[in-house]
Amino acid sequence: GYAPPYIANFERDPAVPTSNQDVELIMNITDYDGTVDSVAIAWSADDTVSILNMPIYTLPLSPGTTDEYEYEIPAQTDGQTVRYYIYAADNDGNESWWPVKPTAQTTPNVEFYTVRDNGMMVYDIQYTLNPNGSSPLAGQEVTVKGVVTSSTKIGDLGYLYIQDESGSEWSGIWCVGIGLNTYYR
């Protein structure tokens, strides 16, 4: 058939691991007009390794399921960024990637996370390797600490901004939501 394997319900747990936590990846992969022939993950904690040269590991079907695949990335050191992508092919040679790779693009896109022993930083929300500029934590509820640099109070900017104490690039964020008027700088 013409349809490639469909990768859905992707989960990474934990979203921001500590250096003593393995990271579990779980997803469902189905092929609606054939069978899933192979599933693999490429990952690296070495940012000098190009995406196309990352080691590749086969993902087995989870026992007792017909479409669930799992992989565990071993614990990494604090501050380490881990990049990865999932690849699936069906019996007709059709291919799929997670995250999605445009047809004309030769290099797969990657998901990534940074290991943090002292909790998430604003940098982890803002820094991205995604070509579309979206956060690696888009759609997830997160807790982050930061220094208030602007508040919603009268005489201030009227918006709540926080940043990491280090104040380097990617380290500031505009906060939206309920209860923001209780923060001061």
Give the positions of each predicted feature.
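Glycan-association/targeting regions that enable binding to alpha-glucans and other polysaccharides
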Residues: 1-119, 135
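OB-fold nucleic-acid-binding modules
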Residues: 1-21, 106-185
